[in-house]
């Protein structure tokens, strides 16, 4: 079976620990999907975007390990693309963006580099999450000021 990773499981060293029998098939781009951050990696449908992914051949044991890691079925749902490739899709509001930790981001960055994936989408997802957090923070400040002055 095949698994498409777009977050921390793009990192070869991390996957070797989680799924020692997983075999990397290489880096690819999934059309019509955009990488986003909601503290951790997620994606959403976007006809103008591509999602960098690493394709892995995995075992049943690896799938169970990934299910546990991804919090399936509560945090992430598991689905198939083209009926063949497993991908985890985070549950909840795709508009609530939030930046990841530096260590988490760096792990993904290393995976992209190892598999020759362009990091433009990774940097754009981080920028979008940081901008969303700033707008949310300013909105909270304005709301607080209104309550104090109102």
Where are these regions (language model features)?
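Glycine-aromatic micro-motifs
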Residues: 1-150
């Amino acid at each position: 079976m095949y698994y498409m990773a777009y977050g921390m499981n793009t990192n070869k060293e991390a996957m070797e620990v989680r799924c020692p029998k997983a075999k990397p098939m290489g880096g690819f781009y999934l059309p019509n999907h955009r990488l986003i951050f909601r503290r951790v990696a997620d994606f959403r449908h976007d006809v103008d975007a591509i999602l960098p992914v690493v394709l892995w051949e995995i075992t049943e044991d690896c799938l169970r390990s990934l299910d546990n890691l991804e919090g399936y079925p509560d945090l992430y749902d598991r689905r198939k693309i083209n009926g063949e490739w497993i991908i985890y899709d985070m549950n909840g509001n795709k508009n609530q963006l939030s930046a990841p930790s530096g260590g988490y981001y760096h792990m993904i960055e290393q995976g992209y580099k190892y598999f020759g994936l362009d990091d433009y989408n990774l940097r754009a997802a981080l920028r979008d999450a940081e901008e969303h957090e700033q707008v949310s923070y300013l909105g909270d400040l304005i709301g607080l000021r209104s309550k104090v002055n109102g």
